[in-house]
Design a protein with these regions (language model features):
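Binuclear metal-dependent hydrolase catalytic cores
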Residues: 1-69, 74-81, 147-171
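Cap/insert and terminal regions of metallo-dependent hydrolase folds
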Residues: 76-167
Length: 171
């Protein structure tokens, strides 16, 4: 997406563009992608998550399997038939529960609810698109939950996992 590439190309040091430097050393090759790219036999489709085209959801497809990666800032979740029947949705920027750190209770009218998905909203996305499994990532310690708290929640829900460093997913 052009806006995303412009933002990435703007990354620089006092010496200039970081990516220009890496490309001059033949370490990288930039290739603008507007809708999709195929690498070997993996098709990667880019779905804009906002009108400005600055936030992207990535849909990976290979051998009849499908994984959606929706990292950050994807609320509201865009409508796309491409999401139907995915094997996995990996999603970030969520709030799990209303009882947060230091006895803070997140009310329905809190502005965070406009930016971040609740656990229940993610389950609604899962149901709407018939997604088989969900992995929550970018878990925030600020919410006051330990990883054990997330593991206990996993036991209560079918096909829901919470990411951890080094996690791998087999499709």
């Amino acid at each position: 997406l052009p806006n995303v590439l412009n933002d990435v190309n703007a990354l620089s040091t006092k010496y200039g563009s970081i990516l220009d430097y890496y490309e001059s050393l033949n370490l990288i090759k930039r290739k603008p992608v507007s809708k999709r790219i195929v690498i070997n036999d993996i098709k990667i489709t880019l779905v804009p998550a906002n009108e400005e085209g600055t936030v992207t959801i990535f849909v990976f497809e290979q051998n009849g399997k499908k994984l959606i990666y929706a990292p950050c800032d994807v609320k509201p979740f865009p409508n796309s038939r491409l999401f139907n029947d995915a094997d996995y949705l990996i999603i970030g920027n969520t709030i799990i529960g209303n009882n947060l750190k230091n006895n803070f209770y997140l009310t329905k009218n809190n502005p965070l609810n406009l930016e971040l998905f609740s656990f229940e909203e993610v389950l609604e996305i899962k149901a709407k698109y018939n997604i088989q499994n969900v992995v929550f990532t970018h878990l925030e310690e600020d919410w006051g939950k330990s990883y054990d708290d997330y593991l206990n929640l996993e036991k209560e829900c079918i096909a829901v996992k919470f990411a951890y460093d080094g996690m791998t997913i087999e499709l």
